[in-house]
């Protein structure tokens, strides 16, 4: 019964996708003049690249429906540990780890039961072969000395350059982990080399998902489970602006838009960094059309002063992701621990022991993580102890929960995820097409003079927008100055109060240093929490103020445009952008880590100064902060030296924090405001373009106008049917999802 229902739903999804493709082809070929008429052909506002992208989206959904394939896109920066996370999910090392971007091209990793050894298929290799020929000529002509100035040439890069000079092409098939690593590393080095030699890498040739490399391997966590209808595939996406390639952002957006679900990998230690912010923006751009999950990697670096799991979930759900994800879909983990633990358990189960560390370096990493820094080679022979240590490390990694809640669920319901993805894509397409076509159809019924008036009114709105942007910049700058002045005043108050409290700690020379250390830690932690809370509230208020200022400026323009178009009979089938908060959310510990100068302890300072610095190091989450030439403890300690050193660090912290604060707020607000005004102007320009094209069509002879009216009305009606049927399909799929939970 369940299988029959899936089949019927997939048939309905395929019918709607095919119908949408046909309608899109009609839009492409829709005649704008009668045969034999000399009137020029006029371009639709849906430009050719725009229509081609929609074709690609529909074709991709058809491909996924035919295989009932659920594609889980994984997005994150290199520093977030994306490759390690994928290896942990798969259960074996299928992607190489290097301290540089490793995903220049998207890569599919498909769960293939029984495929123990990974195999990579790279059928669309022709564009790479052409690139190699171009690079071969450039390498012959280039100055190697200049090349070394703009490119880091390590042994892998030298091997690649030698390979290019010899004309060795890429294969279409690679079997085994090491050949796959070599292929993927070479592809990423190829991107770096092409950039250094000023040769365009053929990214556009790999925009279609069927052209990108595919790794087939059995996921260890899914091995032995019963088979289900459908197929689970991971999509490793390029991080935004990885390897200095800004256009990878567009490729990332395209791949995310075509996924069935999205898994974001964020760095626990850098949750509010610029790089992670770019990832969050890319995810938010996908909207609510696909399910979203978050893995917060490197949670093993949490200390007792850091946010706990619940605090991290609340921060990401409410503040960073603006309510687009629930806390239940956020999983703090250690991907490295998860990968190492599972790799060790797999080796023990299949081979009865771990391989020698000198042959496979991951064993050394595992021993260090599971057994501690003082492990010895002899420890690896105690299999029962190693097995227990691997189980403990797996438990500590917290990876079991996302494996169960995400991977197992995705595998069991891959067919439903594929169908739901198709339904949401159909709804988005039909809604956008219907709004556009309805606007065009009504434009043929409006008098030419009225259309000219609408065009002129939007031109005036564009000019007013530019004028208001210049005026509002001054007001926003004033608000920022007020906020920063107030923040700096508060910071100085905290600085003075903290120094007074620190001085009080060192009044009694007879008090044990361990007691001073404990009280010092408490004092510093309290100060940090106070500053963090105040800055959070203070800049939330600034965010609200900026939103109000911009809304007061923009709303009259928006209302005027909508009113004038409504008077002409146009439905509000267009959407103006909304300004979102752009003021950064501050992590005091992270700011301290970024701006404080590392100062070495001198020979004259006692090791007890190192103890106080250690207090700071734990506060800053920097284990080696301030460590220098420490000597053995002496019998006498000058507490005044300790107090002055600590006070100096507090002064430096507050000074540098004020500077970073000003830079980040100014940069963030300026960028956000410019983006907002640019998007608003773009929306007005698009409206103006639609009206101009409606006017041009309206000026054709009556027979052309009538023909266009008939065609547009029929197409609007058909897209209305597609939308209604897609809603019913989505509801039926959701009913099945609900039934699966019980």
Swiss-Prot record:
<keyword id="KW-0159">Chromosome partition</keyword>
<dbReference type="GO" id="GO:0007059">
    <property type="term" value="P:chromosome segregation"/>
</dbReference>
<dbReference type="GO" id="GO:0043022">
    <property type="term" value="F:ribosome binding"/>
</dbReference>
<feature type="region of interest" description="G4 motif">
    <location>
        <begin position="297"/>
        <end position="300"/>
    </location>
</feature>
<feature type="domain" description="Dynamin-type G">
    <location>
        <begin position="66"/>
        <end position="402"/>
    </location>
</feature>
<feature type="region of interest" description="G3 motif">
    <location>
        <begin position="236"/>
        <end position="239"/>
    </location>
</feature>
<comment type="subunit">
    <text>Forms homooligomers. Binds to the beta sliding clamp processivity factor (DnaN) in the presence and absence of DNA, may bind to the clamp itself as homodimers or trimers. Homooligomers may be able to bind more than 1 clamp complex.</text>
</comment>
<feature type="region of interest" description="Clamp-binding consensus">
    <location>
        <begin position="41"/>
        <end position="45"/>
    </location>
</feature>
<keyword id="KW-0175">Coiled coil</keyword>
<dbReference type="Pfam" id="PF00350">
    <property type="entry name" value="Dynamin_N"/>
</dbReference>
<keyword id="KW-0963">Cytoplasm</keyword>
<keyword id="KW-0235">DNA replication</keyword>
<dbReference type="InterPro" id="IPR030381">
    <property type="entry name" value="G_DYNAMIN_dom"/>
</dbReference>
<dbReference type="GO" id="GO:0006260">
    <property type="term" value="P:DNA replication"/>
</dbReference>
<comment type="similarity">
    <text>Belongs to the TRAFAC class dynamin-like GTPase superfamily. Dynamin/Fzo/YdjA family.</text>
</comment>
<dbReference type="GO" id="GO:1900231">
    <property type="term" value="P:regulation of single-species biofilm formation on inanimate substrate"/>
</dbReference>
<protein>
    <recommendedName>
        <fullName>Clamp-binding protein CrfC</fullName>
    </recommendedName>
</protein>
<dbReference type="GO" id="GO:0003924">
    <property type="term" value="F:GTPase activity"/>
</dbReference>
<dbReference type="GO" id="GO:0043590">
    <property type="term" value="C:bacterial nucleoid"/>
</dbReference>
<feature type="region of interest" description="G1 motif">
    <location>
        <begin position="76"/>
        <end position="83"/>
    </location>
</feature>
<feature type="coiled-coil region">
    <location>
        <begin position="440"/>
        <end position="472"/>
    </location>
</feature>
<comment type="function">
    <text>Important for the colocalization of sister nascent DNA strands after replication fork passage during DNA replication, and for positioning and subsequent partitioning of sister chromosomes. Does not have GTPase activity on its own.</text>
</comment>
<dbReference type="InterPro" id="IPR045063">
    <property type="entry name" value="Dynamin_N"/>
</dbReference>
<dbReference type="GO" id="GO:0005525">
    <property type="term" value="F:GTP binding"/>
</dbReference>
<feature type="region of interest" description="G5 motif">
    <location>
        <begin position="331"/>
        <end position="334"/>
    </location>
</feature>
<feature type="region of interest" description="G2 motif">
    <location>
        <begin position="102"/>
        <end position="104"/>
    </location>
</feature>
<dbReference type="InterPro" id="IPR027417">
    <property type="entry name" value="P-loop_NTPase"/>
</dbReference>
<dbReference type="GO" id="GO:0005737">
    <property type="term" value="C:cytoplasm"/>
</dbReference>
């Amino acid at each position: 019964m369940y299988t029959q229902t899936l089949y019927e739903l997939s048939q309905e999804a395929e019918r709607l996708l095919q119908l949408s493709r046909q309608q899109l082809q009609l839009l492409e070929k829709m005649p704008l003049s009668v045969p034999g008429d000399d009137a020029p052909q006029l371009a639709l506002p849906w430009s050719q690249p725009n229509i081609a992208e929609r074709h690609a989206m529909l074709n991709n959904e058809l491909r996924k429906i035919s295989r009932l394939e659920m594609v889980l896109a994984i997005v994150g920066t290199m520093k977030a540990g994306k490759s390690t996370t994928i290896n942990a999910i798969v259960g074996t090392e299928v992607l190489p780890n290097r301290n540089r971007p490793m995903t220049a091209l998207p890569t599919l990793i498909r769960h293939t039961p029984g495929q123990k050894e990974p195999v990579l298929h790279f059928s669309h290799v022709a564009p790479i072969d052409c690139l190699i020929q171009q690079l071969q000529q450039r390498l012959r002509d280039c100055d190697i000395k200049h090349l070394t100035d703009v490119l880091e040439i390590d042994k892998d890069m030298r091997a690649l350059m030698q390979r290019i000079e010899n004309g060795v092409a890429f294969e279409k098939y690679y079997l085994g982990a090491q050949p796959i690593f070599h292929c993927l590393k070479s592809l990423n080095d190829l991107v770096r080399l092409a950039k250094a030699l000023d040769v365009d890498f053929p990214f556009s040739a790999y925009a279609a998902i069927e052209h990108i490399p595919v790794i087939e391997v059995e996921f260890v966590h899914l091995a032995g489970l019963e088979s289900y209808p459908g197929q689970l595939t991971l999509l490793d996406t390029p991080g935004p602006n990885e390897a200095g390639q800004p256009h990878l952002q567009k490729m990332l957006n395209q791949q995310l838009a075509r996924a069935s679900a999205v898994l974001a990998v964020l760095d626990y230690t850098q949750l509010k960094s610029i790089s992670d912010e770019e990832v969050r923006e890319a995810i938010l751009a996908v909207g609510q059309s696909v399910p979203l999950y978050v893995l917060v990697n490197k949670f093993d670096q949490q200390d007792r002063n850091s946010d706990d799991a619940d605090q991290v979930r609340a921060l990401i759900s409410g503040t960073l992701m603006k309510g687009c994800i629930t806390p239940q879909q956020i999983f703090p983990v250690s991907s490295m621990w998860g990968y190492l633990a599972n790799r060790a358990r797999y080796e023990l189960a299949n081979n009865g022991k771990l391989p020698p560390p000198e042959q496979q370096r991951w064993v050394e990493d595992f021993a260090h993580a599971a057994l501690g820094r003082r492990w010895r080679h002899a420890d690896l022979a105690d299999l029962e102890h190693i097995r227990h240590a691997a189980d403990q490390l797996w438990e500590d990694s917290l990876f079991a929960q996302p494996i169960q809640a995400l991977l197992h669920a995705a595998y069991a319901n891959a067919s439903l995820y594929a169908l739901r993805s198709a339904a949401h894509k159909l709804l988005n397409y039909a809604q956008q097409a219907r709004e556009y076509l309805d606007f065009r159809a009504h434009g043929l019924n409006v008098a030419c003079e009225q259309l000219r008036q609408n065009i002129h009114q939007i031109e005036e709105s564009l000019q007013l927008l530019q004028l208001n942007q210049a005026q509002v910049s001054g007001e926003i700058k004033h608000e920022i100055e007020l906020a920063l002045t107030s923040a700096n005043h508060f910071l100085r108050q905290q600085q003075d109060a903290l120094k007074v409290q620190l001085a009080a700690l060192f009044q009694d020379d007879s008090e044990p240093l361990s007691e001073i250390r404990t009280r010092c830690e408490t004092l510093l932690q309290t100060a940090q929490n106070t500053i963090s809370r105040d800055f959070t509230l203070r800049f939330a208020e600034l965010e609200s103020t900026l939103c109000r200022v911009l809304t007061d400026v923009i709303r009259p323009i928006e209302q005027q445009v909508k009113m004038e178009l409504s008077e002409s009979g146009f439905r509000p089938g267009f959407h103006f952008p909304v300004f979102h908060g752009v003021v950064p959310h501050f992590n005091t510990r992270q700011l301290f880590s970024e701006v404080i100068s590392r100062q070495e302890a001198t020979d004259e300072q006692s090791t007890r100064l190192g103890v106080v610095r250690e207090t700071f190091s734990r506060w800053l989450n920097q284990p080696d902060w301030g460590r220098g030439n420490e000597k053995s403890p002496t019998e006498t300690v000058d507490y005044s030296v300790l107090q002055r050193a600590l006070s100096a660090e507090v002064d430096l912290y507050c000074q540098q924090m004020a500077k970073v604060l000003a830079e980040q707020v100014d940069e963030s607000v300026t960028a956000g405001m410019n983006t907002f005004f640019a998007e608003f102007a773009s929306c007005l320009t698009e409206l103006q373009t639609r009206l101009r094209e409606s006017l041009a069509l309206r000026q054709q002879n009556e027979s052309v106008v009538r023909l266009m009216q008939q065609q547009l009305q029929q197409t609007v009606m058909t897209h209305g049917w597609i939308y209604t049927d897609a809603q019913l399909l989505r509801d039926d799929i959701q009913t099945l999802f609900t039934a699966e939970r019980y």
